[in-house]
Structures are given as C-alpha cells and as structure tokens.
Amino acid sequence: MAGKQAVSASGKWLDGIRKWYYNAAGFNKLGLMRDDTIYEDEDVKEAIRRLPENLYNDRMFRIKRALDLNLKHQILPKEQWTKYEEENFYLEPYLKEVIRERKEREEWAKK
C-alpha cells in the first residue's frame, strides 16, 4: 500500500513540474500549443501536411497571432492563455505515423 502512495505522490509531483514548465516556457501566453512550437524537420512537415484542414487552419491562426503579438511586444489576456489541462497534442498521432512509415521504408531499403 505504501508503494502505491509513493508512486501517486511522485506522479503528482512530476505533473506539478510539467504544469510549471508549461507556464514558464511562455508560449501559452501567446495562445500557442506545445505542438505549434515543435521544430519543423522533414517528419514534422509531413505530419503537418497530413493534418485535417480545420486543425491546420487553427494552427496557422495561432502561429500568426503569436507572431503579431510578439512583434507588438504584447501577450494575450490571462483568460485567453492556453492551459496545460486543455492541451491536446493534435500533431502527435500524425507524427508517430510518419515516423513509423519512415522507419519502415528504411528497413525495406536495407533489404
């Protein structure tokens, strides 16, 4: 029983650090999500290309708004900041699929 409590406590502690870092990074103050800030290598570019139109348009809106705010040296009002609890990693499933396909192609090329 004590082991479960220790795991639960360490999970809460780790989650607290994640929330702190999410807010400390600052991208949420510009209305960006974590996946909006990923470096765009070839895999990420392909995953972005595969996004449904509505997700792609939402992403572009957030990025353009953040660029505009950054240029003006402003941030959004606090009620418009993206929240850790509301974060959905919209690009992750597409990126995993692209990486899996690339690795599969590399395996086929070895044979």
Swiss-Prot record:
Cellular location(s): Mitochondrion inner membrane
Membrane topology category:
Peripheral membrane protein
> Pfam families from the entry?
UCR_14kD (PF02271)
Q: Which residues carry this modification: N6-succinyllysine?
A: K12, K78
Family matches, as Gene3D superfamilies: Cytochrome b-c1 complex subunit 7
**Pathology noted in the entry:** Mitochondrial complex III deficiency, nuclear type 3: A disorder of the mitochondrial respiratory chain resulting in a highly variable phenotype depending on which tissues are affected. Clinical features include mitochondrial encephalopathy, psychomotor retardation, ataxia, severe failure to thrive, liver dysfunction, renal tubulopathy, muscle weakness and exercise intolerance.
Which family does the entry's similarity section mention? Belongs to the UQCRB/QCR7 family.
According to the record's subunit comment, the protein's assembly and interactions are:
Component of the ubiquinol-cytochrome c oxidoreductase (cytochrome b-c1 complex, complex III, CIII), a multisubunit enzyme composed of 11 subunits. The complex is composed of 3 respiratory subunits cytochrome b, cytochrome c1 and Rieske protein UQCRFS1, 2 core protein subunits UQCRC1/QCR1 and UQCRC2/QCR2, and 6 low-molecular weight protein subunits UQCRH/QCR6, UQCRB/QCR7, UQCRQ/QCR8, UQCR10/QCR9, UQCR11/QCR10 and subunit 9, the cleavage product of Rieske protein UQCRFS1.
The protein's name is Cytochrome b-c1 complex subunit 7
Q: Which gene encodes it?
A: UQCRB
